[in-house]
Design a protein with these regions (language model features):
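Pre-Walker A (pre-P-loop) alpha-helix and adjacent loop at the N terminus of AAA/AAA+ ATPase modules
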Residues: 1-35
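C-terminal engagement/docking regions of AAA+ P-loop ATPases
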Residues: 4, 229-273
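The conserved phosphate-sensing helix
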Residues: 4-7, 206-233
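Walker A/P-loop
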Residues: 28-67, 91-94, 161
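Conserved C-terminal "switch" segment of AAA+ ATPases
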Residues: 61-66, 146-152, 158, 167-211, ...
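Short glycine-rich substrate-engagement loop in P-loop NTPases that contacts/grips substrate
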Residues: 66-96
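Flexible beta-alpha connector loops of hexameric P-loop NTPases
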Residues: 74-85, 108-119, 164-166
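Conserved catalytic/switch belt of AAA+ P-loop NTPases
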Residues: 107-139, 143-158
Length: 273
């Protein structure tokens, strides 16, 4: 769903690897390539999904041995005690070796002062990346400006993370398609009034740092299912159509966040007799 520009960037990365492998097999000169990447974008734009896909592609190309994806963040890498942060980084690196390590909100490692243990985590990470360059791929993810600051936090990061893939926010149309696809998979059909309200809901959401993208579409869908259940439970012997149809009454008003546990709405609906 969406991600056209991201798919193009992923193809560029993987095609380069494939051609370099072909050149090596034919004893042609090859250009050393850093496989580590920076992913920038708001939450819910598919960064983890693409990281998982890349891990599988890297394994199929023989870039990594196992192709597992290990996810972590500052809390998984930094300890509040002297000497423990490096050990935590090494422990996570051990789990990820042979696959891909995804560091979410990696910029948080660089936010403290000179004495912050996040700096120790970055220094250790740079050494791990160098020592395990043939066995580990690292993807650092976060907001664009913050990730720029992260790369600038250590002289060794810019050369090891030369490529950035930007994940744009989903359009209103793409968010509607995500909502509709979730409904199709779960056995729910939005009627025209529900579709119109869902589209209006997405159009009203501010595109700021808190914008949840695909997660927002999922939250709105799950909220609609909860609201529909509260509405349908009041119907005596509901029909299959009533059980599977989402109406405008089941969609949160534009500008209002999704919520669960709503009170059943009064209804005079009855199955056709």
């Amino acid at each position: 769903m969406g991600l056209a520009s991201v798919k193009t960037e992923v193809r560029l990365v993987t095609n380069l690897l494939r051609v370099q492998q072909l050149r090596a097999e034919r004893d042609l000169p090859t250009t050393p390539q850093s496989r580590h990447l920076v992913f920038t974008g708001n939450p819910g734009t598919g960064k983890t999904t693409v990281a998982r896909l890349l891990a599988a592609i890297y394994r199929s190309l023989g870039v990594v041995e196992k192709g597992q994806l290990v996810e972590t963040d500052r809390a998984g890498l930094v300890s509040g005690f002297v000497g423990q942060t490096a050990l935590k980084v090494m422990e996570v690196a051990d789990k990820a070796t042979g696959g891909v390590l995804l560091i979410d909100e990696a910029y948080a490692l660089a936010r403290g002062g000179e004495n912050d243990f996040g700096r120790e985590a970055i220094d250790t990470l740079v050494k791990v990346i160098e020592d395990r360059r043939d066995h580990l791929v690292v993807i650092a993810a976060g907001y664009p400006q913050e990730m720029h600051d992260f790369i600038a936090a250590n002289p060794g990061l810019s050369s090891r993370f030369p490529k950035t893939i930007s994940f744009p926010d989903y359009s209103d149309e793409e968010l509607w398609q995500i909502f509709a696809d979730l409904g199709e998979k779960a056995g729910y059909v939005p009627d025209p009034s529900a579709e119109a309200k869902v589209r209006a809901w997405f159009a009203a959401v501010p595109r700021d740092k808190g914008f949840g993208n695909g997660r927002l579409a999922r939250n709105l869908f799950e909220d609609a299912v909860a609201r529909q259940a509260s509405r349908v439970v009041a119907i005596t012997d509901p029909t299959d159509e009533q059980l599977t149809t989402l109406t405008a009454d089941d969609i949160a008003p534009p500008g209002e966040g999704p919520r669960h546990g709503v009170e059943p709405a009064p209804t005079d609906e009855r199955p056709p007799g």
